Design a protein with these regions (language model features):
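Hydrophobic alpha-helical membrane-insertion segments
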Residues: 37-49, 167-175, 370, 447-461
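Cytoplasmic/organellar membrane-interface segments at the starts of transmembrane helices
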Residues: 357-363, 409, 413-478
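Transmembrane helix-loop-helix hairpins at membrane boundaries of multipass inner-membrane proteins
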Residues: 1-9, 15-109, 183-193, 467-476
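Hydrophobic transmembrane alpha-helices and their helix-loop junctions in integral membrane proteins
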Residues: 89-105, 113-130, 140-423
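Short phosphate-coordinating micro-motif centered on Lys-Gly-acidic
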Residues: 135
Length: 478
């Protein structure tokens, strides 16, 4: 039997420990940095320790926080372990990237608290607790996006905050409407009260607005490309590992594992996901800012996850859950590579780069391998998960949706090849980086790349974990 205190440790170590970091910095900045990594590593270890029970044995681990239920099941543990692993690598990358900037205490506090809030959200089995942690991630991301304090940066941080918090308040109205029907905010009790009856369409739409705003999906996606003004570790954290995955996780938690929804809701999600995939991929094809291109790519790839979830088929949902891991590893690597390139060339304009593979061979190779996974090229993990998602879309009886996402996949190949050609191949067009990034930064990128490759080559292991999580979904709220 797994100790339920592991659940609390995964949440409270980073969420509360984060506030000790400025105090530790008074003694030593290096100690602060290592302590931040240790807090995230502790959360990761707690999540991994829950895997045998929640995934292999199929048991649910429960405890309470402020009297409200926390639940660790296959879905929650899979997402929590993925998020904490990638966050740990991002923290280590930050050691050198952030070293010469101001406000470092706030940076480490917010990043660490951000992860703790994510862990709390993932393990919440009560809508009020989920909402509280949802808002904490919004506050942390707001501070991190505006980290450099420039007027433009602050405006873009405010934009992200207003869109995501506004969406959250709309979602809260949906939660209250659910309470009005069931007289409870506990997910298990709501499911019992509904008894398989689909939630009201208005309730579904209100909750969906909040989900889409957090996951930067059309038509509330514009804040994510603008968030590229943040430090690269932050954009990697927001775009790959944690923030944008919150929305798809909550969708899976509420509408795959929890409550039924109508055919109208099903069609609405498919239409919005298809539009989001194509529009954002088209924007990525013409954009010249490397971080904005990768951000638009994230908007497009999140749409693939929504396709898999909305398909409602076992293969599609499994592919969607698996792609949370595969996209997180590969896209995290791409953003950190972009950070090294920007750090060394002092520009984000890909038309001012070129030929950087000669001076940054490890970064160039890492960018290529991570790109191949996002493109969905075999034997990388992105291939298997995307193939399952598209198969799920085909099985759902919407051939136009499948065709749209196949076209989106083609666009993905085109814009990622365009970046690689402009940045790393050919002759220098302007800014030429003099050398690779620091060992810590390059090592972090290499770690994500290796994990991305291994996850594809050894697909049976992560694929089996995702499959177990999906098989448990319809019975996880007890």
């Amino acid at each position: 039997m797994t100790d339920p205190s592991l659940l609390l440790a995964a949440i409270l170590l980073p969420a509360l420990g984060a506030f000790l970091l400025p105090l530790i910095a008074m003694v030593s900045k290096s100690a602060r940095n290592v302590s931040a990594a240790a807090l995230v590593f502790g959360a990761f270890c707690a999540n991994v320790a829950l895997i045998p029970t929640a995934l292999w044995s199929g048991e649910v681990v429960e405890t309470t926080l402020v009297g409200l239920r926390l639940v660790a099941d296959g879905l929650a543990v899979f997402v929590a372990a993925t998020s904490s692993l990638i966050s740990l690598i991002i923290i280590i990358y930050s050691f050198d990237y952030i070293d010469h900037y101001e406000h470092q205490n706030e940076y480490y506090l917010m990043v660490t608290m951000f992860l703790g809030s994510m862990m709390g959200l993932v393990y919440s089995s009560n809508l009020i607790l989920l909402f509280a942690f949802w808002e904490l991630t919004g506050v942390a991301s707001w501070r991190l996006i505006g980290y450099f304090r420039k007027d433009t940066d602050v405006k873009r941080a405010n934009k992200a905050f207003l869109i995501t918090v506004g969406g959250a308040l709309v979602m809260l109205i949906g939660f209250v409407m659910l309470w009005n029907t069931t007289r409870t905010f506990d997910l298990a009790e709501i499911k019992t009260q509904l008894g398989g009856t689909p939630v009201d369409d208005w309730v579904f739409v209100l909750i969906l607005i909040g989900i889409l705003s957090k996951s930067a999906t059309l038509p509330v996606h514009t804040w994510l490309p603008d968030a590229g003004v943040a430090p690269s570790p932050v954009t990697s954290l927001l775009h790959a590992a944690v923030l944008v995955k919150i929305g798809v996780y909550v969708f899976a938690r509420l509408f795959i594992a929890g409550f039924a929804y109508s055919e109208f809701g099903h069609t609405l999600v498919l239409v919005l996901a298809a539009a989001s995939a194509l529009v954002s991929a088209g924007a990525a094809l013409v954009e010249t800012d490397i971080k904005r291109i990768i951000a638009y790519s994230t908007v497009s790839q999140i749409a693939f996850i929504f396709l898999g979830l909305a398909s409602g088929t076992p293969v599609g949902v499994t592919g969607a859950i698996l792609y949370i891991l595969m996209h997180g590893l590969a896209k995290g690597g791409l953003f950190l590579c972009a950070g090294i390139v920007e750090h060394q060339t002092h520009t984000k304009d890909i038309t001012q780069m070129g030929g950087l593979w000669r001076k940054m061979p490890v970064t160039a190779l890492s960018f290529l391998l991570c790109s191949l996974s996002v493109m969905g090229i075999p034997p990388f993990g992105g291939f298997f998960s995307k193939a399952m998602v598209i198969m799920g879309g085909a099985e759902s009886g919407h051939p136009w949706v499948t065709g749209t996402f196949v076209l989106g996949a083609v666009f993905t190949v085109l814009y990622l090849l365009r970046i690689y050609n402009k940045v790393f191949l050919g002759e220098p067009a302007g800014k030429g980086g003099s050398h690779e990034g620091s060992r810590t930064m390059v090592g972090s990128v290499a770690a994500l790349t290796v994990l991305s490759v291994v996850a594809g080559v050894a697909i049976n292991w992560p694929g089996r974990l995702a499959e177990i999580a999906v098989n448990q979904m319809m019975g996880i709220i007890k």
